[in-house]
Swiss-Prot record:
Domain of life: Bacteria
GO molecular function list: ribosomal large subunit binding
Name assigned to this protein: Ribosome-recycling factor
Subcellular location: Cytoplasm
Species in which this protein is naturally found: Chlamydia caviae (strain ATCC VR-813 / DSM 19441 / 03DC25 / GPIC) (Chlamydophila caviae)
UniProt keyword annotation of Cytoplasm present: yes
Family note: Belongs to the RRF family.
Function comment: Responsible for the release of ribosomes from messenger RNA at the termination of protein biosynthesis. May increase the efficiency of translation by recycling ribosomes from one round of translation to another.
Recorded name of the encoding gene: frr
InterPro entries, per database record: Ribosome_recyc_fac (IPR002661), Ribosome_recyc_fac_dom (IPR023584), RRF_sf (IPR036191)
GO cellular component: cytoplasm
GO biological process: translational termination
Any Pfam family matching the protein: RRF
Amino acid sequence: MSSLTDTEKKMAAALEFFHKEVRSFRTGKANPALVETVTVDVYGTTMRLSDLASISVADTRQLVISPYDANNVSAISKGIIAANLNLQPDVEGTIVRIKVPEPTAEYRNEVIKQLRRKSEEAKVAIRNIRRESNDKLKKDSDLTEDAVKGMEKKVQELTDKFCKQIDEITKQKEAELSSI
């Protein structure tokens, strides 16, 4: 049974990775995930923006970044520009404002293509985990053939469950992109 829980944990990790990737897609609405992973050169090293500042949503099209150290404002602005996210930071004293532009139809279509590609990659990862798990089950000499078949069926049920969740996340994001 421990191999089944290991398989489920691996599949959950693959789903979470997909979910994080999808959250960072720009939909035209302000979302802290757009800039959280931007790297900024400060203190002689590079750090993630989420470690340097508080990121909040001012309204549906604007993010406000409040650095923990006001001296990092210009470095944060430069980091956002360098990240090439098509976002323009606006420094106002000790905060940075980012207006999120309305996406064009062409951009939306491109993001939907990326979303579908990432969705398929996540499903492939889930299926690879299933294959690894089934291979381990077949190599386990302690299990009878019937037990192996039963476990394979449970692994397939897990695979179906996680693939369905990926499809649901994809549909939600596509709907969000289409409604802009």
